[in-house]
Amino acid sequence: MSSPLLDLEPRLLWQHFDGIRQIPRPSKHEEKISEHVENWASERGFEVRKDEAGSMVISVPATEGRENAETIILQGHLDMVCEKNSDVDHDFMTQGIEVEVDDDWVRAKGTTLGADNGIGLAAAMAFADDPEVVHGPLEILATVDEETGLTGAKMLDPSILSGKILLNLDTEEDGAIYMGCAGGADTDAFMRASRRRGLLGSVPVKLAVRGLRGGHSGLNIIENRGNAIKLATRVIQAALYAGIDVDVVSIDGGSKHNAIPRECFAVCRLDKGALDEFRGVAAACATDFHEEFDATDPDLEVVVEEMDDDEATRRVLNIHARDRLLRLLDSLPHGVLSMSREVPGLVETSANLAVVETQEDGLKFVTSHRSSVMPALFAVRRSVTSTFRQAGASVSYDEHYPGWKPNPESPILKRTADVYERVFGEQPEICLLYTSDAADERG
């Protein structure tokens, strides 16, 4: 049966994408798509170079008369995100993607389409194939494992490239040119905490801060959305300041390093006679929180629920551990730390208190930081490390992603924008990404 993509324009682009979408290419399993691209290059006499990670560079000779032009690198990645609906029977390791054309949209049937970044790879191949395109020397850089680890970008052997100008073909918005991106780093910690039995006459309660919007710690950090961990900490501290003797059994909030926590749950113990007063403090805090965050988190709620008294809720943090924990959560930075001095409206540096998880012998913390200026990124990491260590926590680091500092005066940016306006009759939108995954690939 003929593919519905083959009649679409521009034909070369869709012909290449049609070939790509039929090839299984999960992250870390790019062998078949790599072979497909390599065969395409060999059939045309293009030189192919590979590095140890499996990324490849295809050298495309210049058209006649353009041999002395600068080499341009066209970059994309070979793998795709593999997700399917629960009612779809599909094996991404052995099957290609079934597609349909719905008006102006190309869609997959119950699975991800793989246009990220199959369409970018197809565009580079079509560009090299089109006899009417006049160009200088080209290098098509196709990296591996972008979606699950950026392995190809991080392990790229620069010796397989000769060009100095790179155009990344893995973006989402029509009419947008991206000129910079934040780098990122995670700082994790573990704080040991001793326990004791709760006081006689005390009862367990669950404090829930929920209903917040959360969101991506890069894209949404500028909106100043509430952090449920921070807010739950404030409720407990407010109760202590009000003279209520609150013991903490556990605090758990957040789930992912790159997400703003939407919920946080704290199990506490307090004297039964102080329960109404504690509820009053929580209600007052909720009023304050709505005054601060109603524009971003209108569904925020603070709830106090009584719990069954059992052995698990009777083992509370000792007072020293409780106070260290609350001071730590209160002190860890969260939100926008600085705005760019060069690009109006751009977040330059931020921090995200992402996860707190109570374990038997202590508490685990996950924090993430972003900046388009690498010295600022490492300064935040050092500051967060100092805060953890002052609380007696041990610290560990994940690998950082390098940032890509924006340069509004970049000659290639200006040339690209001029060409876009000449071809499409309108000015492109010049954008910046505040997510770290793209920085590693483009920077």
Ranges and model annotations:
Residues 3-105:
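Acidic/His- and Gly-rich active-site-bordering loop/insert found
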Residues 18-22, 254, 267, 301-314, ...:
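A short beta-alpha structural unit
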Residues 60, 209, 268-272, 369-371:
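Short beta-strand-to-loop capping motifs
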Residues 66-148, 153-164, 319-322, 330-349, ...:
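Active-site metal-coordination/substrate-binding segment of hydrolases
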Residues 136-228, 240-241:
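Fold-level recognition of mixed alpha/beta catalytic cores in primary-metabolism enzymes, strongest
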Residues 197-202, 221-252, 272-350, 384-389:
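Acidic-enriched catalytic cores of C-N bond-cleaving enzymes acting on peptides and small amides
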Residues 338-390, 394:
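Non-catalytic terminal/interface segments that mediate subunit docking, oligomerization
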Residues 434-443:
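Single conserved hydrophobic/aromatic residue that forms the stacking wall/gate
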